[in-house]
Amino acid sequence: MRSSTLQDPRRRDPQDDVYVDITDRLRFAILYSRPKSASNVHYFSIDNELEYENFSEDFGPLNLAMVYRYCCKINKKLKSITMLRKKIVHFTGSDQRKQANAAFLVGCYMVIYLGRTPEAAYRILIFGDTPYIPFRDAAYGSCNFYITLLDCFHAVKKAMQYGFLNFNSFNLDEYEHYEKAENGDLNWIIPDRFIAFCGPHSRARLESGYHQHSPETYIQYFKNHNVTTIIRLNKRMYDAKRFTDAGFDHHDLFFADGSTPTDAIVKRFLDICENAEGAIAVHCKAGLGRTGTLIACYIMKHYRMTAAETIAWVRICRPGLVIGPQQQFLVMKQTSLWLEGDYFRQRLKGQENGQHRAAFSKLLSGVDDISINGVENQDQQEPKPYSDDDEINGVTQGDRSRALKRRRQSKTNDILLPSPLAVLTFTLCSVVIWWIVCDYILPILLF
């Protein structure tokens, strides 16, 4: 089923080529030299086609649109009449970051289209003790929390199970349009339930090359998609009345950029979301750290996903979500959120009584002091109320993240979109050539 260039693949040299059989026709390979073409084999690579756009030292996982594009590419190749007799080999090179993302895509394909379990997909990929470096967050500096390929595969499997992921109804054009800074910088984390988006400003403008959007930019889109509730987590950069006057509920839950929320904020956020009539749109400054953290709390409570699985899923939907200490915070909150979710579902089933409530309260009081991975829950005292001034002076994590996203998308646009001057020059040249042909050359040819 699998093969390596070594006689004993379990002790392979890191520089040896590895081939892994996914199906009888599809293979995944790590190659340290360019493969030679053959009549019965089709090689292809996506290393320079589907590329992660990093904020800092982060390098993956690739986003949902890229997973979709990859799966479509594989299905098309497997169904191609010209390749029916060929083996299809997806190969990656020596770059460990590219290897991890390539393996991520192959594993997602196995889970989504081949019905493999996350564990089975992972076992196939790690044949020969093939090492894959884990994914890290988008924060600046050192990292002490990672998500693995297996975490990602579990996230994708559970997303399918709970209806978050359905490529039969996935709208690629909409995803890629609205994720761009100039088009709103928003992503659905749970379809029809949660949107994460960049914080609006008092007026729409282009500031230092970055598109700042007013609340009005989002209003029609939100109405078209049954968004009823807006939750702001950063300082006030627009008047909430501009949303409420348009018929939306608006809530402010401030906490500092790059920090973790208090228990009171988490509880209030969950209460708002659980009572919202429609979808909820959540933002902080960049719509990454604080936004991802609170949406992750909801997912962990209501779907019993682990912290690592949840972080993996929200980053697949919107790269960069959940930053620095927010990762360990979610690990610490996992058990208590699961218990809260169990009680919530129990209550919905009409099984609540005084004994249930008393027992649940006792459980939660014990969970407050539980140590997970050697980290004690020390959120016993409420910190001082968050002040807007905390984000006014100096450059925050959100500022840096937005600036990076704007710069990289500007570079992409520079490559993909010709300048107005180039278009005008091309048009004028075409007119001149056509005039010469019609006025001089064509009469000679005809007569």
UniProtKB/Swiss-Prot annotation:
EC number: 3.1.3.16, 3.1.3.48
Source species of the chain: Homo sapiens
Protein name in the entry: Dual specificity protein phosphatase CDC14C
GO molecular function, one term: protein serine/threonine phosphatase activity
Gene3D superfamilies linked to this entry: Protein tyrosine phosphatase superfamily (3.90.190.10)
Additional remark text: May act as an autosomal functional substitute.
Catalytic residues (UniProt): 284 (phosphocysteine intermediate)
Keywords from the named record: Endoplasmic reticulum, Hydrolase, Membrane, Protein phosphatase, Transmembrane, Transmembrane helix
Subcellular location: Endoplasmic reticulum membrane
Catalytic activity as recorded in UniProt: O-phospho-L-tyrosyl-[protein] + H2O = L-tyrosyl-[protein] + phosphate; O-phospho-L-seryl-[protein] + H2O = L-seryl-[protein] + phosphate; O-phospho-L-threonyl-[protein] + H2O = L-threonyl-[protein] + phosphate
Lineage, broadest ranks: Eukaryota, Metazoa, Chordata, Craniata, Vertebrata
An individual GO BP term: cilium assembly
Coiled coil regions, renumbered to chain: none
Region B, annotated ranges: 183-349
Entry remark concerning the domains of this protein: Composed of two structurally equivalent A and B domains that adopt a dual specificity protein phosphatase (DSP) fold.
Membrane spanning residue stretches: 426-446
InterPro entries in UniProt: CDC14_C, DSPn, Prot-tyrosine_phosphatase-like, PTP, Tyr_Pase_AS, Tyr_Pase_cat, Tyr_Pase_dom, TYR_PHOSPHATASE_DUAL_dom
Summary of the function given for this chain in its UniProt record: Dual-specificity phosphatase. Preferentially dephosphorylates proteins modified by proline-directed kinases.
Residues in the signal sequence: none
A single GO cellular-component term on record: mitotic spindle
Main location class: endoplasmic reticulum
Protein family (similarity comment): Belongs to the protein-tyrosine phosphatase family. Non-receptor class CDC14 subfamily.
Ranges for region A: 14-168
Domain Tyrosine-protein phosphatase positions: 184-344
Membrane topology label: Single-pass membrane protein
PANTHER family: TYROSINE SPECIFIC PROTEIN PHOSPHATASE AND DUAL SPECIFICITY PROTEIN PHOSPHATASE
Region (Linker), start-end ranges: 169-182
